[in-house]
Amino acid sequence: MRHRCRVPRLGKPADQRKALLRALTTELIRHGRITTTKVRAKAVRSEVDRMITLAKDGSLAARRQALGYLYDPQLVGALFEQASARYGQRQGGYTRIIRTIPRRGDNAEMAIIELV
């Protein structure tokens, strides 16, 4: 049973939430590290791990799934070239979340999420 195993809603409708997670995933893979709220960082962690696992697989079907999710096609090519060399021995846990000081305007818990 999958009781209480839901995705964080992030205070947004489903389409906006999916677009936000896609954008955060794309930017994290592009820059290697982003600053966001702690809840968003925890939500995007599973998506980034899924993209890196697809890149380690390296098959055409995995590449097409990544192209359908990430916003930048050139980024998909770079990810698929580097993932097996960078994360070849690692079985998951490709990201690290570091808590930082709260945001000034609304005191939201902030975090830095980065690729290991």
Swiss-Prot record:
* InterPro entries linked: Ribosomal_bL17, Ribosomal_bL17_CS, Ribosomal_bL17_sf
Keyword Ribonucleoprotein attached? yes
Q: Which residues form a coiled coil?
A: none
Recite the UniProt keywords alphabetically.
Answer: Ribonucleoprotein, Ribosomal protein
Q: Name one GO cellular component term.
A: cytosolic large ribosomal subunit
| Molecular-function annotations in GO | structural constituent of ribosome
PROSITE patterns assigned to the protein according to its UniProt record, in alphabetical order: RIBOSOMAL_L17 (PS01167)
Q: What are its GO biological-process terms?
A: translation
Q: Which domain of life is it from?
A: Bacteria
Family assignment from sequence similarity = Belongs to the bacterial ribosomal protein bL17 family.
Description of how the protein assembles with itself and partners: Part of the 50S ribosomal subunit. Contacts protein L32.
Q: What is this protein called?
A: Large ribosomal subunit protein bL17
- The organism encoding this protein is Cyanothece sp. (strain PCC 7425 / ATCC 29141)
Question: What lineage, starting at the top, does this entry show?
Answer: Bacteria, Bacillati, Cyanobacteriota, Cyanophyceae, Gomontiellales
Q: What gene does the UniProt entry assign to this protein?
A: rplQ
